[in-house]
Amino acid sequence: MKFTVEQKDPLSKARAGALTTDHGVIKTPIFMPVGTVASVKGVHQRELRDDIDPDVILGNTYHLYLRPGTGILEEAGGLHKFMGWERNILTDSGGYQVYSLSNNRKIKEEGVKFKSHIDGSQHVFTPENVMEIQRTIGADIIMAFDECTPYPCDYNYAKRSMHLTHRWLDRCVAHLDKLPFKYGYSQSFFPIVQGSTFKDLRKQSAEYIASVEAEGNAIGGLSVGEPAEEMYEMAELVCDILPEDKPRYLMGVGTPINILKNIALGVDMFDCVMPTRNARNGMLFTAHGTINIKNKKWENDFSPIDEMGITFVDTEYSKAYLRHLFVANEYLGKQIATIHNLGFYLWLVRTARERILAGDFLDWKIKMVQQMDKRL
């Protein structure tokens, strides 16, 4: 993997870059649609490729391990071939999903014992087998196995958890060195900064992660319930420590406003279920604010869903029609809304990149944040 910073914004810490893997170039800043179980909910791969057009999508190690399982994925020749996606894929390590199973998991030095949310069967994740699972899944970018702390979090617990994450990281690195690539292309490895919302822990973790000299670095344990200002404070602190010549990935973030503000702090990569999940509930993101398409005010609005939108659904269908689909509980409504929201997120990060390259990102960001904060 090769990463190049092409341009830095003169008035913020934003940067435009390019990350090159064996499956192509990822232009940053980038938003990665979440394809948890080898599909982005409600979207065909053809629509994803031709209309939404992301350079990279995200898959989930926990879910793919449980279903379809590594045996099927290996037989298929890896996740790319299994799902018919020729561009880049990043897999998370399953740490966050295990964290979210708080009542059905036990964390020890060796790893995490957990019960499947599907059938209650018992499983164990260790740094070693998570590296093996991710080798078999075959994503272009794979993540270290970490523990994600909840919010709020006791300082002593956050400290113990951070040190555990660091010890697990050492085991990930040692084991990964023994595992050859499986499908004729290389994989890049990102460790994860933890430390909850404690400045000294975040600093310590960022310094430790930077010392590993991996191909990229991730920031985890944010967007788990903390106030947005705390998230920004932690992200800025960590970005200032992580090396400039490596991509920085803020995991699980966020709203369009969150994304723009974190780009200004030096973050390059984002993922979040928000555009797809909110779409299925009738919430549309636009450059002028958010729309609850189920509201009666859209019943007679025959204007396009979004005249500025980049996907075919934005101009082919009206707000009134989309509202009708939601009121009638037609699944097509959720699909249209999902394509719109993902298209908007990709438009947002692409335009941010253009503005960084043009040197006027900050003014544009301030204006966009004000506009997007409105309810239409």
Over which residues does each language-model region extend?
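C-terminal extensions of enzymes
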Residues: 1-18, 26-32, 41-42, 146-153, ...
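C-terminal helical cap(s) of enzyme catalytic domains, especially alpha/beta-barrels
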Residues: 70-76, 279-293, 346-349, 358
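A non-catalytic, amphipathic alpha-helix used as a structural packing/dimerization or gating element
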Residues: 129, 133-137, 160, 164-171, ...
